[in-house]
Curated annotation (Swiss-Prot):
Belongs to the 'phage' integrase family. XerC subfamily. CDD domains: INT_XerDC_C (cd00798). The active site is at residues 155, 179, 246, 249, 272, 281. This is Tyrosine recombinase XerC. The gene is xerC. GO terms for molecular function: DNA binding; tyrosine-based site-specific recombinase activity. Gene3D superfamilies: 1.10.150.130, Intergrase catalytic core (1.10.443.10). Transmembrane segments: none annotated. HAMAP family: Recomb_XerC_XerD. It holds the Pfam family Phage_int_SAM_1. Its main location: cytoplasm.
Length: 305
């Protein structure tokens, strides 16, 4: 079986998405997904796969998905891989290198709706109000990092990409580059402004001096380092619960939505392109909503009666 016809333009495709401004993380994910697809197609019996792009069919791609599913990959991961494959096929079709897109009518595996985990507001306030050792630059940095994470609801990739000149302390907002390199402005809380003012004079800088959050050597903190610092902080000062940047973002969204009830505003602040993505946060804390109902509705039955 020959897959050269389908894989021949792989490098050109990756070069193209780099020119389009896709992040290194995104390009690396596309590379992995497509290399995995080529390997899966190469392992299939010759009667299951065509030899050139024009012969590839819907069946070939559904068979590849089925094999990945048998390996235990969840629906979310399978849907992402299918999306990567589809984008490559569309790119080939647009350039006349593939007759039709064989993935066009393949529906991604249905993903179970998962309500994001949010941290209790009281717990977060207590943790963020813990004393900070002003003589320890890393402790001051971490406090600013965590205040920003919860106070503005940024993704870990967005925090990683922040430069010092993205922060406007006098105006109390931060310029964020999100998914798809979309730009947005997000307000800063008073606590975040205070923490950043304490941190910036202590910030270590490398030669370019751009990164907002840096390590001892002055280089930009990686996403993994940010995740690790947050987990360590929670483990050392909290009650043993696991905490991730994603949970901090979920907490920001859920708490803000509970207080404001303005889902459109929360959508803008989070940088969601679709309202349906934001709507999942309406299910974050049904108990809280039920208590409000009990307290406010004249015909509600008190749950403690």
């Amino acid at each position: 079986m020959v897959l050269d016809g389908f894989a021949a333009h792989f490098d050109a495709y990756l070069e193209n998405i780099v020119r389009e401004g896709k992040s290194e993380h995104t390009v690396a994910a596309y590379r992995r997904d497509l290399e995995e697809l080529f390997a899966l197609l190469a392992q299939m019996p010759s009667e299951d796969v065509g030899g050139v792009p024009q012969d590839l069919s819907r069946r070939d791609f559904t068979a590849a998905l089925r094999r990945l599913s048998q390996r235990g990959l969840n629906a979310r991961t399978l849907a992402r891989k299918l999306s990567s494959w589809r984008q490559y096929c569309v790119w080939l079709v647009e350039r006349g290198l593939l007759h039709t897109d064989p993935t066009a009518d393949i529906k991604p595996p249905k993903q179970p709706e998962r309500v994001p985990k949010a941290l209790p507001q009281e717990w977060l306030n207590r943790m963020l109000d813990l004393p900070v050792d002003g003589g320890d630059p890393l402790a001051v940095r971490d406090h600013a990092l965590f205040e920003l994470m919860y106070g503005s609801g940024l993704r870990v990739s967005e925090i990683h990409g922040l430069n010092a000149d993205d922060v406007y302390l006098d105006e109390a907002w931060v310029h964020v580059t999100g998914k798809g390199r979309k730009q947005r402005q997000v307000p800063l809380t008073g606590k975040s402004v205070e923490a950043l003012k304490n941190y910036l004079p202590l910030r270590q800088t490398a030669s370019d001096g751009k990164a907002l959050f840096t390590g001892r050597n002055g280089t930009r903190l990686s996403q993994r380092q940010i995740q690790k610092r947050l987990a360590q902080w929670a483990a050392q000062n909290g009650d043993g619960r696991h905490v991730s940047p994603h949970m901090m973002r979920h907490s920001y969204a859920g708490h803000l939505l509970q207080a404001s009830r303005d889902i459109r505003a929360v959508q803008e602040l989070l940088g969601h392109s679709s309202l349906s993505t934001t709507q999942i946060y309406t299910k974050l804390d049904f108990d809280h909503i039920a208590r409000l109902y009990d307290e406010a509705h004249p015909r509600a039955k008190r749950r403690d009666e």
